[in-house]
């Protein structure tokens, strides 16, 4: 390990956290995972059936819910100290869901199955309460603004936090004028800046969507190549078409680049976006000719979560509280990494070995020095990310660093050298060598592109002489067999079923007892709540 490659700033922080009395702080980091996946039929068509009642109420079940569509499930683990327990929890959720799916399957990759016409993709329904209706109308607005097809892309969100005591320890060594809460927020925003600089590396290592079903593009122009079969489009060196400009894109959001200089400027930019009318949306209005709601408002964003980003600063919200209100009131609590593809070779879409590397990577982003992003740096970060998702495995690919081209493999290897001492520290804290082993696995992918998930997807399709849909269905069937032959214990099954039953009762109680406020007034109050916040 070349210690001289580390900045003095990072070395100082690592030495502090590595002291015997402080090492246990790294055992207290929290890890949570959210995994989205489509329900499909045995013939790889979208399952347009309602969300299975046996899974509980999507509005109130904290572990099994829906994302955009009735057909798009979302599994949510609690935030746990041991990532092995987080992955195990995710695995148990899958096993419970499979016990209630009948003949349906969970779609294995991020990019969707062949989709029906947009009008036949069902929007997720959350019942008749005002908050349930608000979630439904918000999704109608997403359909209006971006189309339903884009909303059917699935991913993995990885939530990570350091314990507050770790931030308090680091604050003691720095000249920072604010209080502990401000320092923690300041530090998480600094983490996000570094994540923007280096997240291309995650796309190279874990991108797993180099191909898609041709129908996904709905006839739009593209530069993809046809191969494998008539319905498959791909790019030969792509790592993640999901995260490319083929995926989620928005003209309205094009000028919305929240400043990651500090929490105040970040929340201000989002507040402005949810309060600023956007002409094409104004022309449509909030209601159709029948008086039905079609979007919550005509602003750049209906709500702050509409802003699409690779990573978000987060704070757990109280009941009825909006995300920005929570951030302004109590500061940043954790980050949500949002750019991870689902690995179609893994039953849960993510492995413990991957989780251990992400921990070390995010911790590196947190502990390394993080200057403010200059305008050219923002531009380079975006173009580097786009280059890697579209052609990350291209031999000799160069990225831009400090306004100079640098070979991807050279930069990636240098980053690995800097992340290694953090992996070593995590191993010392946990009495293991698993983080260093994960570093070695990732370095092997840098040395040999054939080991990356994106290359393995294309190699498997080639070996089996199949297109995207046939490959994805085969993987989905393999995982279904795994989960169905590994059922939960009777007690675990009963616990999940009780949670599902309770969630249905909670939704019914909410609908029966909520204060009678007409929906228009409710939406108006919801909109006003964000305008009244003061930093």
Swiss-Prot record:
Alphabetically ordered keywords of this record: ATP-binding, Glutathione biosynthesis, Ligase, Nucleotide-binding
Species of origin: Pseudomonas syringae pv. syringae
Pfam families: Glu_cys_ligase (PF04262)
E.C. no: 6.3.2.2
Record protein name field: Glutamate--cysteine ligase
Gene3D superfamilies referenced in this protein's UniProt entry, alphabetically: 3.30.590.20
A cellular component annotation (GO) from this entry: cytosol
A biological process term (GO) from this entry: glutathione biosynthetic process
Gene that specifies this protein: gshA
Enzyme class: ligase
Catalyzed reactions: L-cysteine + L-glutamate + ATP = gamma-L-glutamyl-L-cysteine + ADP + phosphate + H(+)
Statement: the UniProt record of this protein carries the keyword Cytoplasm: no
């Amino acid at each position: 390990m070349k210690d001289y490659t580390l900045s003095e700033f990072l070395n100082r922080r690592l030495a502090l956290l590595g002291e015997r009395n402080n090492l246990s702080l790294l055992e207290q980091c929290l890890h949570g995972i959210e995994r989205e996946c489509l329900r499909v039929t045995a013939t790889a068509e979208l399952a347009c059936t309602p969300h299975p009642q046996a899974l509980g109420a999507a509005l109130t079940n904290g572990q099994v819910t829906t994302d955009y569509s009735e057909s798009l499930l979302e599994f949510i683990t609690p935030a746990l100290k041991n990532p092995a327990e987080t992955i195990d929890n995710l695995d148990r959720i899958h096993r419970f869901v499979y016990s209630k799916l009948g003949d349906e399957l969970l779609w294995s990759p991020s990019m969707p199955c062949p989709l029906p016409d947009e009008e036949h993709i069902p929007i997720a329904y959350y019942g008749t309460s005002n908050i349930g209706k608000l979630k439904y109308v918000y999704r109608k607005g997403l359909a209006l603004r971006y189309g339903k097809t884009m909303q059917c892309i699935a991913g993995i969100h990885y939530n990570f936090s350091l314990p507050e005591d770790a931030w308090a320890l680091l604050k003691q060594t720095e000249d920072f004028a604010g209080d502990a809460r401000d320092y923690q927020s300041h530090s998480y925003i600094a983490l996000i800046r570094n994540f923007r600089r280096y997240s291309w590396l995650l796309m190279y290592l874990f991108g797993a969507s180099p191909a898609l079903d041709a129908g996904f593009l709905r006839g739009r122009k593209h530069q993809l190549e046809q191969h494998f079969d008539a319905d498959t489009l791909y790019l030969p060196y792509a790592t993640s078409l999901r995260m490319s400009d083929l995926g989620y894109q928005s003209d309205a959001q094009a000028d919305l680049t929240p400043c990651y200089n500090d929490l105040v400027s970040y929340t201000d930019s989002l507040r402005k976006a949810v309060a600023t009318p956007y002409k094409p949306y104004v022309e449509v209005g909030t209601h159709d000719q029948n008086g039905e709601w079609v979007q919550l408002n005509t602003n750049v964003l209906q709500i702050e979560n509409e802003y699409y980003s690779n990573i978000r600063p987060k704070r757990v919200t109280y009941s009825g509280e909006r995300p920005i209100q929570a951030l302004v009131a109590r500061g940043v609590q954790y980050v949500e990494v949002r750019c991870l593809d689902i690995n179609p070779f893994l039953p849960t879409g993510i492995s413990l070995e991957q989780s251990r590397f992400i921990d070390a990577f995010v911790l590196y982003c947190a502990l390394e020095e993080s200057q403010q992003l200059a305008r050219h740096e923002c531009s380079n970060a975006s173009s580097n990310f786009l280059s890697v998702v579209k052609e990350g495995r291209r031999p000799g690919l160069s990225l831009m660093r400090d306004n100079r081209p640098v070979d991807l493999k050279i930069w990636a290897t240098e980053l690995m050298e800097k992340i290694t001492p953090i992996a070593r520290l995590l191993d010392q804290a946990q009495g293991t060598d698993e983080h260093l082993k994960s570093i070695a696995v990732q370095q092997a992918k840098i040395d040999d592109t054939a080991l990356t998930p994106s290359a393995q997807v294309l190699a498997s399709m080639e070996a089996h002489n199949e297109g995207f849909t046939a490959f994805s269905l085969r993987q989905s069937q393999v995982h279904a067999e795994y989960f169905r032959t590994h059922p939960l214990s009777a007690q675990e099954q009963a616990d999940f079923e009780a949670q599902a039953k309770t969630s249905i009762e909670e939704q019914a109680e909410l609908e029966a007892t909520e204060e009678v406020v007409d929906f228009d007034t409710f939406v108006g109050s919801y909109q006003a709540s964000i305008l009244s916040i003061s930093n």
